[in-house]
Amino acid sequence: MPLTPDARELLSLLAYVYLENNRPEKSAVLLNALRTLDLADNRQLATLALAQLRAGKSEAAMATLDLLAMQGGVDASFHLIRSQALLALERRDEAAAAMRAYVALRPAPAAAPTEAETT
């Protein structure tokens, strides 16, 4: 029986709740199940890599990030998670390069309204 879209969303939401409540291992299990079923989108793969990283599994996080990159999911958050994983693996030069890529790709902050615009 295939997983319904609602069930998929529920697993993703539960994984997020686990991650936010300092249970990265449980989050990784749920997200890895979605990946195994070929139901994980790029956001869920990035969250899986973050959960693996927070669970102390930096090598697994790098493997997940490699998969994400092959699927075209390279964005600012990808580089941020990658820099953290590389730093955990003590690959400082690569971590610095990934952080520079994150800074280059992150969205520009919204400009604060000027006094003339607020009056």
Predicted regions and their residues:
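TPR/TPR-like (Sel1-like) alpha-helical repeat modules
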Residues: 70-74, 83-109
